[in-house]
Amino acid sequence: LFDRMEHLSDYTKGYLQGIMQAQMKVYGYYFIEELLSKEIIEDMQHSLPLQPGNDSVESTEWLFAHYVIARKIANLERTALLKAVSEHFNTKLYTPNPTPELSQIHNMGSVDYQRQMPYVFKNSAINLNISLRSIRSGIPLRCFDIMGCGGFLLSNYQGDFYEHFVPGEDLVLFESQEDFLNKGDYYLKHDNERRQIA
């Protein structure tokens, strides 16, 4: 949806790029909605008419922050992290989508989630979770699937992990791209620790 907003003013484009880059540096708090002024929303609506339904409790700011901008941030962040990890490690990605921008990734196509994905989770050295930033504290279901299959999980910070799991014992959390790469490298070199956590 974000990329469909082709008629944004240069100011709005720059502003949105700036706040998205700032959000990508902060884990554990999603602040985008707070930064969307009336003028920015009006400019975005001009390019992408989006309104909450009559019986909706969400505001227009919430819709743009969570449905449009959060998804764009996730796309940018996932692409950047996958590019970085694929430059250092043999990396496979299971997706039905083509990934020409990730030339060093081995795109394995899609697999059946019920029959084949548990095998992938269990037998992958490291399974990555990069959550939508608009998921403020919750744990994505895929994380439970990975850990339930005995897979090793390296995930971005989500507050609820601390309520249900012990980081470093049940899973490993990263706080930045550098931390992500360092922990990936460490656990690939320390099989026993990785297997114990998995």
Which residues fall in each region the model found?
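Catalytic binding pocket for nucleotide-activated donors in carbohydrate/polymer assembly enzymes
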Residues: 72, 96-198
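Conserved catalytic-core segment of nucleotide-activated headgroup transferases in glycan assembly
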Residues: 1-123
